[in-house]
From Swiss-Prot:
Keyword terms of this UniProt record: Cardiotoxin, Cytolysis, Disulfide bond, Membrane, Secreted, Target cell membrane, Target membrane, Toxin
Disulfide bond annotation, renumbered to this chain: 3-21, 14-38, 42-53, 54-59
SUPFAM superfamilies given in the database record: Snake toxin-like (SSF57302)
PROSITE patterns: SNAKE_TOXIN (PS00272)
Tissue: Expressed by the venom gland.
Protein name: Cytotoxin 2
The family this protein is said to belong to: Belongs to the three-finger toxin family. Short-chain subfamily. Type IA cytotoxin sub-subfamily.
Source domain of life: Eukaryota
Lineage: Eukaryota, Metazoa, Chordata, Craniata, Vertebrata
Cellular component GO terms, alphabetical: extracellular region; membrane; other organism cell membrane
Note: The sequence of the major component is shown, it is called toxin V(II)2 and the minor component is called toxin V(II)2A.
Amino acid sequence: LKCHKLVPPFWKTCPEGKNLCYKMYMVATPMLPVKRGCIDVCPKDSALVKYMCCNTDKCN
């Protein structure tokens, strides 16, 4: 599985066990990702921060 890094078009290969790509962004600025990468479990959204997770190649 390959997930985008914070600055596309760069990406990295996920280590074993981290089989989800995720994108974290502030609710106030949904078009500006704060963090991207590989993760094992999708975190819960909060009032300020949202997470978008998926299990396909480079979809974050």
